[in-house]
């Protein structure tokens, strides 16, 4: 279990804000930090990793104190059993894929670990290649593989898939989910993609101006729990067109474009680019902005 009770003042585009977190993260959870840029999401990841220091508070992981402002305890990053994957994969350009993994190996005598991770991440065919010859998706798979070489208890993911196309993004989301389950890791992801949150997470912290405003499952945080229906889909509004007394919405959901009809009252607060929840009741679609 990760016990966080920290405070840090941040300088943002909105001025100074206080990042205040008093939460517990359970072992094996897949938690997403969701919110606007500058809300404190990445800073919280960096604080957990030991790359930034809170002004006050405490971080306890299991029975080990990682940070305690009163006791003057602050474990350096190399003593915290975490893996960190950034949007920028940060691979060593002069090393092959195998070389990047071997460099991260704690026990240099255990080369079998490299082969195991290459197989799990399905990148064995890339082992002799250097990063410059890899696609964006391949580089991120190697970055995740390199992180797994250290056997981390906690996997910190700072928008690692945001620069990828939708097809590769979906594939790597599945791979992250498999890695999370297979290794029993506690994962913390920063993401702006609601569909990604639903695919990966069992818990969400919604953060605004340094404060956690919502804490719950993706459905609890993003969807109106008063809505009942046979199904619920998250999508992005691509277009809104008037047709007689109705409106036709084109919505991108799960990499597919679907069309939904609605009356004016259904879409009064909905505009192009909004994320919406589509649910169905008695064959009638219900649209809810989220």
What are these regions (language model features)?
Residues 149-153:
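A short, proline-enriched helix->beta-strand linker immediately N-terminal to the Walker B motif
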Residues 130-134, 138-140:
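Conserved ABC ATPase signature
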Residues 64-68, 109-126, 178:
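Conserved ABC ATPase "signature" region
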Residues 155-159:
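Catalytic Walker B motif of ABC-type/P-loop ATPase nucleotide-binding domains
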């Amino acid at each position: 279990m990760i016990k966080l009770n920290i405070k840090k003042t941040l300088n943002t585009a909105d001025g100074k804000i206080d990042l205040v977190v008093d939460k517990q993260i359970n072992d094996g959870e897949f938690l997403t930090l969701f919110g606007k840029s500058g809300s404190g999401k990445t800073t919280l990841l960096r604080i957990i990793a030991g790359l930034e220091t809170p002004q006050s508070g405490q971080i306890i992981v299991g029975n080990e104190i990682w940070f305690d402002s009163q006791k003057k305890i602050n474990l350096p990053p190399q003593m915290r059993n975490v893996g960190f994957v950034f949007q920028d994969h940060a691979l060593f350009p002069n090393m092959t894929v195998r070389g990047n993994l071997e460099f991260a190996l704690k026990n240099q005598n255990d080369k079998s670990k490299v082969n195991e991770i290459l197989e799990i991440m399905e990148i064995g065919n890339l082992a002799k290649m250097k990063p410059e010859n890899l696609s964006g998706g391949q580089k991120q798979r190697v970055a995740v593989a390199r992180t797994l070489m250290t056997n981390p208890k906690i996997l910190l993911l700072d928008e690692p898939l945001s620069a990828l196309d939708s097809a590769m993004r979906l594939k790597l989301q599945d791979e992250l989910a498999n890695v999370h389950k297979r290794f029993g890791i506690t994962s913390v992801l920063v993401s702006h993609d609601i569909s990604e949150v639903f695919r990966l997470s069992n818990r969400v912290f919604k953060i605004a101006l340094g404060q956690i405003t919502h804490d719950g499952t993706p459905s609890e945080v993003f969807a109106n729990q008063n809505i009942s229906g046979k199904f619920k889909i998250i999508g992005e509004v691509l277009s809104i067109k008037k047709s007689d007394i109705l409106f036709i919405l084109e919505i991108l959901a799960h990499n597919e474009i679907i069309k939904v009809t609605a009356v004016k009252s259904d879409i009064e607060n909905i505009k192009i680019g909004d994320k919406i929840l589509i649910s169905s009741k008695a064959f009638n679609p219900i649209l809810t902005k989220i």
